[in-house]
Amino acid sequence: MNRPRPVEKMVGIIKKLPGVGHKMAERLSYHILKMPQVEVDRLIDSIQNARRTMKCCSICCNLSEHDPCPICSDVTREKNIVCVVETPQDLIAVSKVEDYKGLYFVLGGALSPLDAVGPDDIRIDKLIKRLKRDSINEVIIATDADSKGEITAVYLADIIKILGIKVTRLGYGLPVGGDIEYADEITISRAIAGRKEM
């Protein structure tokens, strides 16, 4: 027996979420259908509210309710160092490390020639404009330790070095092929401390 069309549509939409396969989408769909209506309404409201209120910070491109975001607005942070990450989730992971007091920049992805993601598809131009505008002495490249992250790191390092800015890469306390957002604070802290100039 086939699933009812509304459920099939729901499964199709949910499985578009990252890390959600067909079976998980099916489980989530049926779970949502069993939830009390008040909980479903809360879920819908929270999604709509987040979509409505979250903005992209005009300085670092992090998601925030405010522009500029609280990190960019924090006068106690070191303004001459920028940590470049792929996603807002990576920024959150790195920001849990108390050792790092600088600023951030969220690329919005990583270069991936196989997926046709080039420099124009992520915020490299915006990063370079910021580096030229602000008095930045060092850029820490904190892209993932996978092939896409490495390609992105090398590409960025080549461009940023031309500007006369020191470029470092997180030390390899992070596992190769791993995502920064899943690393614990101690690992990220050691990676920041062990960063190397590129």
UniProtKB/Swiss-Prot annotation:
Pfam families membership: RecR_C (PF21175), RecR_HhH (PF21176), RecR_ZnF (PF02132), Toprim_4 (PF13662)
GO molecular function: DNA binding; zinc ion binding
UniProt xrefs under InterPro entries: DNA_Rcmb_RecR, Rcmb_RecR, Rcmb_RecR_Znf, TOPRIM_dom, TOPRIM_RecR
Keywords tagged on the record: DNA damage, DNA recombination, DNA repair, Metal-binding, Zinc, Zinc-finger
Occurrences of domain Toprim (ranges): 80-175
Family statement: Belongs to the RecR family.
Entry keyword annotation includes DNA repair: yes
GO BP annotation list: DNA recombination; DNA repair
Task of the protein: May play a role in DNA repair. It seems to be involved in an RecBC-independent recombinational process of DNA repair. It may act with RecF and RecO.
First and last residues of each zinc finger (C4-type): 57-72
Protein name: Recombination protein RecR
UniProt cross-references to PANTHER family, sorted A to Z: RECOMBINATION PROTEIN RECR
